[in-house]
Amino acid sequence: MLSKSCRAISQRSFSQSSLVFANYGKPQNPPIDTEIKLKIQPIVRTGETIEVKRARLLYQSRKRGILESDLLLSRFADKYLKTMTMEELDEYDKLLDEADWDIYYWATKNYKITPLPDKWKDSKILKEIQKIANNEEKVIMRMPELNLEPESNTK
């Protein structure tokens, strides 16, 4: 007959090896969400004149980093930025604070990939960008010239 200490050792070894065997091949750490979600707060600009704001928004519309967004936003800026009110410029500025791919999917109405937030559902600016994305005129899109000067009729 086995002594008490020998039985305790064999039970401990058996129960420990059972746990190791039961977990064999399973991941030992919980799964890690590999997508990092980081929202950088936009810079609060105070005392910016309307001309400076238009120039900054024109640059930010064109230099996004994603060609598709650059094309849509720079064409929008070229067409509308010169005549927008300060309130419209503020709304457009807030739209440009969103992620590039989100803006692109909203502009192309691809809401399955990136759902449209409630705050942009009634946006006239986004609707105009969506019209540009539809390209109803069937023109070949290219980057417009960087120019904030009004077009002159004198030649």
Curated annotation (Swiss-Prot):
Domain of life of the native organism: Eukaryota
GO BP: any one term: tricarboxylic acid cycle
Compartment annotation: Mitochondrion matrix
Cellular compartments per GO CC: mitochondrial matrix
Location (main, coarse): mitochondrion
Gene3D superfamilies: Flavinator of succinate dehydrogenase
Xref: SUPFAM superfamilies: YgfY-like
HAMAP family, per the entry: SDHAF2
PANTHER family given in the database record: PROTEIN EMI5 HOMOLOG, MITOCHONDRIAL (PTHR12469), SUCCINATE DEHYDROGENASE ASSEMBLY FACTOR 2, MITOCHONDRIAL (PTHR12469:SF2)
Record-stated family: Belongs to the SDHAF2 family.
Note: This protein may be expected to contain an N-terminal transit peptide but none has been predicted.
Protein name in UniProt: Succinate dehydrogenase assembly factor 2, mitochondrial
Protein source organism: Candida dubliniensis (strain CD36 / ATCC MYA-646 / CBS 7987 / NCPF 3949 / NRRL Y-17841)
